[in-house]
Regions:
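Active-site-adjacent elements of ketosynthase-type condensing enzymes
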Residues: 36, 40-45, 102-106, 185-212, ...
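Short beta-strand-to-turn element immediately C-terminal to the catalytic PLP-Schiff-base lysine
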Residues: 10, 231-235, 281, 312, ...
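Short pre-catalytic strand/loop immediately N-terminal to key active-site residues, enriched for Gly-Thr
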Residues: 122-127, 147-154, 216-220, 322-333, ...
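Condensing-enzyme catalytic core mediating Claisen C-C bond formation in acyl metabolism
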Residues: 1-2, 25-30, 206-283, 291-292, ...
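Active-site-proximal alpha-helical scaffold in enzymes
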Residues: 71-83, 135, 140-143, 148-184, ...
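Glycine-/small-residue-rich "gating" segment that lines the acyl/pantetheine channel
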Residues: 116-123, 161-164, 168, 177, ...
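Conserved beta-ketoacyl condensing-enzyme motif
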Residues: 1, 18, 22-154, 183-192, ...
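Flexible, low-complexity linker/loop segments at domain and module junctions
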Residues: 1, 89-90, 283-289, 319-320, ...
Length: 405
């Protein structure tokens, strides 16, 4: 991995996102995008102070969906960070970039136009602008990369799937470099209402940054987030020859499904456990070689307990020696972007020798009894880190990243 780009609730670029996560600074606050005063939940982790004109033409800044615009910001940063311009033939650079929902806000806006102004006023760009693959296609147009390009969709595991599949494409020889990641921008009254109806969200009116409490006994739900993250992957030997900054390497990757419920985790954690075992096997690693897990850790009562159970099943006694943290305690849950953002957290953790904390962890839960790096970053060098991602529909993905000496 030679380039990182991010637009998140913690900052407008990858370095500021990482610094804030390590410092335990929260991106969770009262919703600004609309008046949420009539909702039982009024908080979210929004991308703040994003200026579309910095990443797109005035025309595109007006017509493209927010999820595409923040994707452009993350992608341009990652390409610049990797020094990728002119290195490879455009035909050999691919893009695997997904989203869970796509151009949701544009769909609602055009539905309002149809209802209020009639069918003749619906924008001709409406349909191309809201597809799940719009962002991956628009990134290719903006950057000129003509290699393999598609939009993996696995709900909240989308970003993880994109990163893992990108590595597989490069291994097969289908591309020399891949931009991989995900984005989501769906903080909207309808989405908020839907999650409120599911009773999945945390409500914290007095102090929003305390709402997301992964693995804490008082956790009461997740916090909606938004963001985009792109990681540039290349062949290790080629990156070394050209003198690129190498943050980390991908050692293994696996997917699975719970085959249990569309919205609830399997309490036995069979699918998640099998996924981690398979990733370790593919990487040729023993469980004892893993030093850090960036957990899916959404702060839901069922989800955090199930993930902890899976970690203990796979790692045995070593589970209690592992460091496990959830950066969703400060980013909220960025859905399709989450897996990519958290893969980036693992990359920086092994590269920088510091583990980001789980904030707001104050009350131990007997079902969640591991080392969750509570409330303060931990300077420690780990050689291998694992990023877990789980999504609605039972989709699971994990990526193993290793330090490059």
């Amino acid at each position: 991995m030679t380039g990182l780009g991010a637009v998140t609730p913690l900052g407008g670029d990858a370095p500021s996102t990482w610094r804030a996560a390590v410092a335990g600074e929260s991106g969770i606050d009262f919703i600004r995008a609309f008046d949420a005063s009539e909702f039982p939940v009024r908080i979210a982790a929004e991308v703040k102070d994003f200026d579309p004109s910095q990443v797109a033409s005035p025309k595109d800044a007006r017509r493209l969906d927010r999820n595409v615009l923040i994707s452009l910001g993350a992608a341009r940063e990652a390409v610049a960070d990797a020094g990728l311009d002119g290195v490879y033939s455009p035909d050999r650079v691919g893009i695997l970039f997904g989203t869970a929902i796509g151009g949701f806000i544009s769909i609602i806006e055009q539905a309002d136009v149809l209802r209020e102004r009639g069918p003749d006023r619906v924008a001709p760009t409406f349909l191309p602008n809201v597809l799940v693959d719009t962002a991956s296609g628009q990134l290719a147009i903006a950057l000129g990369f003509r290699g393999p390009n598609y939009a993996p969709v696995s709900a909240c595991a989308t970003g993880s799937t994109a990163v893992g599949e990108a590595a597989e494409l490069i291994k097969r020889g289908d591309a020399d470099a891949i931009l991989a990641g995900g984005a989501e921008a769906c903080i909207h009254p309808l989405v908020l209402a839907g999650f409120c109806s599911m009773r999945g969200l945390a409500a914290e009116d007095e102090h929003p940054p305390r709402a997301s409490r992964p693995f804490d006994a008082t956790r009461a739900g997740f916090v909606m987030g938004e963001g985009a993250c792109v990681l540039v992957l290349e062949e290790l030997e080629v990156a070394e020859r050209r003198g690129a900054t190498i943050y980390a390497e991908i050692l293994g990757y696996a997917m699975s499904n719970d085959a249990h419920h569309l919205a609830q985790p399997d309490p036995e954690s069979v699918g998640v456990g099998e996924m981690m075992r398979r990733a370790l096997e593919r990487a040729g690693l023993e469980p004892e070689q893993i030093g850090y897990i960036n957990a899916h850790g959404t702060s839901t009562p069922l989800g955090d307990a199930a993930e902890t159970r899976a970690i203990k099943q796979v790692f045995g006694d070593h589970a209690y020696k592992l460091a496990v943290s959830s950066t969703k305690s400060v980013t909220g849950h960025c859905f399709g972007a989450a897996g990519a953002i958290e893969a980036m957290m693992c990359v920086r953790a092994v590269h920088d020798g510091v583990l980001p904390p789980t904030m707001n962890y104050e009350h131990p839960d007997p079902e969640c009894d591991l080392d969750y790096v509570p409330n303060q970053a931990r300077p420690v060098q780990v050689d291998v880190a694992l990023s877990n991602a789980m999504g609605l529909g039972g989709h699971n993905g994990c990526v193993l990243v290793g330090r490059v000496p």
